[in-house]
Swiss-Prot record:
Location (main, coarse): cytoplasm
Protein name: Transcription-repair-coupling factor
InterPro entries xref list: CarD-like/TRCF_RID, CarD-like/TRCF_RID_sf, DEAD/DEAH_box_helicase_dom, Helicase_ATP-bd, Helicase_C-like, Mfd, P-loop_NTPase, RecG/Mfd
UniProt entry tagged with the keyword Transmembrane: no
Family, similarity comment: In the N-terminal section; belongs to the UvrB family. In the C-terminal section; belongs to the helicase family. RecG subfamily.
Organism: Rickettsia conorii (strain ATCC VR-613 / Malish 7)
A Pfam family of this chain: UvrB_inter
GO biological process: regulation of DNA-templated transcription; transcription-coupled nucleotide-excision repair, DNA damage recognition
Domain Helicase C-terminal: residue ranges: 779-933
GO cellular component, one term: cytoplasm
């Protein structure tokens, strides 16, 4: 075995270098995970123009899964195997793959040589022959083909979608192929013609008489004759695919090959991580085999017989032994000098008071003997780098392949490099390192609103509110022609079947109503304006009250909190994990609050398990160890006994050795001990108290309460919150929640309460896989056993106490081999504590409980949750419950079950849709905001306001309240934008379907566009779109240009801007006094500018589409400058 040292970032470059120099030698480049494999492949395609570079993807399912892998992955794997088999050229081949794929048993190497089809125009072939070939090769026939592995027959035309996905349309005529063309899957319109088409099977399993015969014999040999009622068996022998049948692949063939067999005595290039992946995958498939075998002992899963691991996979020892017989290259990485390349540039530029790019160009000059490549993995960074190079007056060469690179010039390319490196001939610099910036100071609330606007988009049939016309119903997004050009409009229905069309660039006038029941307003009626005016007066009173509450707290000055920095650093060093960026930002926010001389009032909004408690502990340390306070005290208030016990244990462990007296007060504490604790709180002997509602009594007196921490504040009742208010008036306050109550979120969004967001997940955290489904004992058994056999435990949540015993009986039947215990709120606190302690210790498998576990449970080994009758729970409850699992490195699985016969309300359906679709890590804030939409803002200041909200809807109410608070803070702010400029330039204005196909996402983007308030935001949004979707089509670019023009028109009091072939017509807002400016403009541009009798301004200019935006901007600029 040859060992070579190389920079880690250059792994693919090294492989290509060897591949190019050894023209008769095949290579396998291995990766330690699937993400790395795909990145190495993309890099290799840049480094080499050789067509014999292949990528073999991994299944996106777990071993012994009952679902089939993604269709594109199945097709790509089969296509790669065929290319490896049928490539008859004398040139060598390079295969890039995740090392675990070497253990897969694959069809025999020679099998695929006869199962591919090469088609070309004028070839003799019929539609029937091709359709038969496709069915035998695992394609699915549908009315229209929209996914990989599908085909459609329409007379003499066959449409087929291959891996990629790439779609082809084959025309036949009189038994011959007339033409082969690519077509667009979304529009179904043909594009370019093809000279040749090679069709590979859509799956590694080909269903023909030979493979079906093998399956019958091998099935009989492995599982016996009892298969007459097995749906999988019946489907296969009938020549039909069955979901998950890929787990029986070896049964279809006489023998199997491994991936190495498909190449000619290859050299294996690997590193220690990719080598280790072989053993990890073997361990994984053995674990899943054990789980599946146990599940199959009862006949719940009889559709899926289980092959032994040695039948389905090669062993690690077999593959390792095979590799040892070959010439292998083990890469060891030397990173120190190379990895610091960009860091050194940044450091020296700071010392020499130069920009990073000044120093970079000096480095480039010093390396003029090398070919310089600056690579970016995203289009927006790529465009930005080109712009910077131009600003420095350098020339650049845009390249797609490394062999296009030139010396004595900067080469720029799209290439997914994650670190800069250099070789004798090349210097590779990554744009991501060059452009790396500190966290943006962009307003947090603004960013969050952008996310919410995009996620919480309008749905057809939903009630909306127009600022001027009242409540209507959104029908659809409709394209209308304006001056012969397509333009997207929102179509809104009003009473009397009246319709209102709103151009997408003015979408901000529409707000969601937020309720399923509403009475439509009549267009042109004065009743809406009257209702809105009355509400505005009431909102002014509410806003003033909220301002007074916040101002009163700010008037209560507080001494700056000072603490021993060396001792604090020691406390921080004891934290066993690396802080995430968001945690560090939140901690710094708290430091500033405690030192600014005013009482802190901050909300930490962070997803479950994202480290809010550690942030709170830092705050506790700062205050409890304050050097300028006499016996400062900290109270941590939590909603449940379970959470109280858990926090108490953690605080004791975390603060060990720092001389702080920590106690807990909850229902598990005896009355005698509680009396002592109350006395010590009053005397100042206790530094930190952690308690439930037991702390919220008038008989609790503190000696010197300086910090109040409210954990999961959404769980406290109105009376408890009133008592908390009395504590808060003279103490620093830190509230924490993943899904804050609407009132707290409302105050944070309006700037009355400071807000810190922890949205960065801890390292290696995986999102929880969430399924909403009818109650199914087969799936539940499978889920519980799978968790058990990977060494874990499960939660079974039952909303109602009366249903718990029935569920317990069902569990005895479904999983008799697993143990369970029950916990619910009416049990004695000591009994709940006993059950929870046993569950923590792993003494039983399933905890059957009510929702009492939604806060505070943190068990790394418990990663499966079944929620019974999930439709009975609120959105935030569902989210908090799901947050109990997947808190370690194992993926969590949540199954939200509903009764199959039950008809759910629209609100229940929507809750379940939201929780299923909000799987991404960090969705808590979104959930809280969606909860606002589902149930309104609730009780903002102690008086019921749902009636007021119902008048105008949740979004407009929120906007009106925010606006009024802003006015009280700054009297110069105009109370309401008096008009919305209308821009009509006769251009195509819409987001094309071939750019953003998803209609819901498109509406979300339109809503975000309506929220853009200045040119910088528009440009930032444009960069984001390029990064996500690619270069902007002209129609979308027109839309964003018009938004910028609209913003400028508002500043200039222009209500309408219209264009025609011969120039522009401007109408000014009626209340705007623009007389002097207009007269001055007409005088300055007397040859082109005229005033009409109706006071409209006419500007004469010959216009064409390609320059109309430029001319409009120039006109507005000239008008602003006079």
């Amino acid at each position: 075995m040859l060992q070579q040292k190389f920079p880690a970032a250059a792994k693919s470059f090294f492989a290509i270098d060897n591949f190019t120099k050894n023209l008769k030698q095949d290579f396998i480049l291995s990766a330690s995970n699937e993400e790395e494999a795909l990145q190495l492949y993309k890099q290799a395609l840049f480094f080499s123009s050789n067509e014999n570079i292949y990528y073999f993807p991994s299944y996106n399912t777990i071993p012994y899964d009952h679902t089939s892998p993604n269709a594109n992955i199945l097709s790509r794997r089969a296509e790669t195997l065929i290319k490896l088999t049928t490539n008859n050229s004398n040139s060598n081949k390079l295969l890039i793959t995740h090392t675990a794929n070497l253990l897969n048993k694959l069809p025999p190497k020679d099998f695929f040589s006869k199962y591919f089809l090469k088609l070309s125009p004028k070839m003799k072939f019929t539609t029937d022959e091709l359709a038969m070939f496709l069915v035998e090769n695992s394609f699915t026939r549908n009315a229209s083909s929209i996914d990989v592995g599908e085909f459609a027959v329409r007379g003499e035309i066959i449409d087929i979608i291959l891996s990629g996905p790439k779609a082809y349309r084959i025309h036949f005529s009189w038994g011959y192929i007339e033409s082969i063309k690519e077509f667009d899957i979304d529009t179904q319109i043909s594009t370019k013609s093809c000279r040749e088409l090679i069709i590979s099977p859509a799956n590694e399993i080909v269903l023909n008489s030979e493979t079906i015969g093998n399956f019958k014999n091998n099935y009989l040999r492995n599982f016996g004759v009892n298969h007459t009622d097995n749906a999988l068996y019946e489907a296969v022998i009938s020549g039909r695919k069955f979901t998950g049948y890929e787990q029986l692949l070896p049964l279809f063939y006489d023998s199997c090959s491994n991936l190495i067999d498909y190449l000619n005595d290859p050299i294996f290039i690997f590193d220690n991580l990719s080598k280790k992946a072989i053993l990890e995958f073997e361990h994984s498939y053995n674990d899943f085999y054990s789980a599946r075998s146990e599940a199959n002992k009862l006949k719940f899963n009889s559709f899926y017989p289980t092959l032994s691991p040695t039948s389905l996979y090669f062993t690690a020892s077999e593959i390792t032994e095979l590799l040892e017989q070959k010439n292998n290259i083990l890469l060891t990485f030397e990173n120190s000098e190379q990895a610091s390349l960009i860091k050194n540039i940044a450091a020296t530029s700071f010392i020499e008071k130069k920009t990073v790019f000044d120093k970079l160009f000096e480095v480039i000059k010093a390396n003029s003997h090398k070919k310089i490549i600056i690579g970016s993995s995203v289009l927006s960074s790529f465009e930005r780098i080109k712009s910077i190079i131009q600003n420095y007056e350098y020339k650049y060469n845009e390249i797609n392949k490394l062999d296009e690179a030139k010396a004595s010039i900067i080469n720029v390319a799209i290439i997914p490099l994650n670190q800069s490196f250099y070789t004798k001939e090349y210097l590779f610099i990554t744009a991501s390192e060059l452009l790396e910036e500190k966290p943006s100071s962009t307003n947090t609330n603004k960013k969050l609103k952008n996310i919410l606007l995009e996620l919480d988009n309008l749905a057809e049939g939903e009630f909306v509110v127009h600022k001027d016309h009242g409540i209507g119903q959104f029908l659809k997004l409709e394209a209308l022609e304006i001056k012969g050009k397509p333009h997207d409009f929102l179509k809104i229905l009003y009473a009397g079947n009246d319709k209102l069309y709103i151009p997408v660039e003015s979408i901000e006038v529409i707000k969601k109503y937020g309720n399923d029941n509403a009475e439509l307003d009549k267009l042109g009626s004065v009743s809406w304006q009257r209702s809105k005016a009355k509400l505005k007066k009431r909102i002014k009173e509410i806003a003033l009250h909220l301002i007074q509450i916040a101002a009163k707290r700010k008037l209560n000055s507080s001494a700056s909190v000072e603490f021993d920095l060396e001792e604090y650093d020691k406390f921080c060093a004891n934290f066993p994990f690396s802080e995430t960026e968001d945690q560090l930002i939140a901690i710094n926010d708290i430091k500033e609050d405690l030192r600014n001389g005013m009482l802190m009032d901050r909300l930490i909004c962070g997803d479950v398990g994202f480290g809010k408690t550690e942030v709170a502990m830092r705050a506790v340390f700062m205050v409890a160890k304050s050097l300028n306070e006499h016996l400062p005290q900290v109270a941590v208030v939590v909603p449940t006994t379970i959470l109280c016990s858990q926090h108490f244990s953690r605080f004791i462990e975390r603060f060990k050795g720092f001389g702080l007296n920590i106690k807990q007060l909850s229902s598990v504490i005896s009355s005698k001990e509680a009396k002592i604790i109350r006395s010590e709180l009053e005397s100042g002997k206790i530094n930190i108290i952690i308690g439930t509602h037991s702390l919220l009594h008038k008989n609790i007196k503190f000696f010197n309460l300086k910090l109040l921490i409210i954990d999961e504040e959404q769980h406290f009742g109105v009376g408890q919150k009133e008592f908390l208010k009395s504590l808060k008036s003279s103490s620093h306050v830190l509230a924490m929640s993943a899904t804050p109550i609407p009132r707290t979120l409302q105050m944070s969004m309006t700037g009355l309460k400071e807000l810190s967001i922890i949205a960065t997940p801890p390292l290696n955290r995986l999102e929880v896989h969430t399924s909403v489904m009818p109650y199914d004992p087969v799936i539940i058994r499978d889920a519980l056993l799978r968790e058990h056999f990977r060494g874990g435990r499960s939660f079974y949540v039952v909303p109602r106490i009366k249903d718990i015993e029935d569920i317990a009986k069902q569990l005895k039947q479904i999983v008799p081999e697993l143990s369970y215990k029950i916990a619910y709120g009416k049990m004695t606190p000591s009994k709940i504590d006993e059950v929870m302690s046993e569950f923590y210790a792993g003494k039983f498998d399933i905890l059957v409980s009510t929702t009492i576990i939604e806060s505070g449970i943190d068990i790394a080994e418990a990663n499966t949750m079944i929620i019974h009758n999930a439709d009975m729970l609120g959105l935030s409850q569902l989210y908090q419950l799901r947050g109990r699992i997947g808190r370690g490195k194992m993926r969590g699985y949540a199954y939200l079950t509903v009764a199959s016969h039950k008809k759910m309300t629209s609100h229940s359906l929507r809750r379940l849709e939201i929780i299923q679709n909000s799987c991404a890590l960090g969705s808590g804030f979104t959930i809280a905001s969606r909860d606002m939409d589902l149930r309104g803002f609730g009780n903002l200041i102690g008086e019921e306001q749902s009636g007021q909200i119902k008048e105008v809807g949740t979004e407009l109410y929120q906007e009106m309240l925010e606006e009024q608070i802003a006015i009280f803070k700054d009297e110069s702010i105009v109370s309401e934008q008096p008009f919305i400029p209308t821009i009509n330039l006769g251009l195509s204005v819409f987001i094309p379907d071939n750019y953003v196909a998803d209609a819901a996402l498109k509406l979300g983007l339109y809503r975000r566009i309506g929220n853009l308030s200045n040119e910088i935001e528009v440009e930032t949004f444009k960069d984001e779109m390029i990064d996500r979707f690619g270069l902007l089509p002209i129609e979308f670019n027109n839309l964003l240009d018009i938004v910028k023009i609209k913003l400028l028109c508002f500043k200039l009091n222009i209500e309408n801007l219209d264009s025609g072939d011969n120039g522009f017509v401007i109408k000014f807002y009626k209340n705007a006094d623009m007389t002097d400016k207009i007269l001055k403009f007409v005088t300055t541009y007397s040859n082109q500018a005229k005033i009409k009798p109706d006071n409209k301004l006419v500007y004469i200019k010959k216009l064409v589409d390609k320059n109309i935006i430029v001319e409009a901007n120039q006109l507005l600029w000239n008008l602003s400058e006079v």
